[in-house]
From Swiss-Prot:
The modification 4-hydroxyproline is found at residues 65, 81. Belongs to the conotoxin O1 superfamily. Pfam families: Conotoxin. Keywords: Bromination, Disulfide bond, Hydroxylation, Ion channel impairing toxin, Neurotoxin, Secreted, Signal, Toxin. This is Mu-conotoxin-like Cal 12.1.3a. Residues 20-42 form a propeptide. Expressed by the venom duct. The modification 6'-bromotryptophan is found at residues 78-79, 85. One of its GO terms (molecular function) is ion channel inhibitor activity. The cysteine framework is XII (C-C-C-C-CC-C-C).
Length: 86
């Protein structure tokens, strides 16, 4: 029973290992993790319409220097201010 509980806990925490562990290895910053890359490409700021990055009802204007998450090439941050992730 104890072994089963340990395995269940490990399986639940395994996908979130990058959130739990330190983001630096031997003083060097780690590269973008698959978890964060997946979040960027799949779920956040998934379309650029009229210079605005649209996601979950939020938008970031191109002309706004503060909190801007978009440019003409698309999203430049992995989150937009005002989304459900804030």
């Amino acid at each position: 029973m104890k072994l089963t509980c340990v395995l269940v806990v490990l399986l639940l925490l395994l996908p979130y290992g990058d959130l739990i562990t330190n983001s630096y290895i031997r003083g060097a910053a780690r590269k973008v993790t698959p978890w964060r890359r997946n979040l960027k490409t799949r779920d956040v700021c998934d379309s650029l319409v009229d210079g605005r990055c649209i996601h979950n009802g939020c938008f970031c204007e191109e002309s706004k220097p503060n909190g801007n998450c978009c440019d003409t090439g698309g999203c430049v941050w992995w989150w937009c201010p005002g989304t459900k992730w804030d």
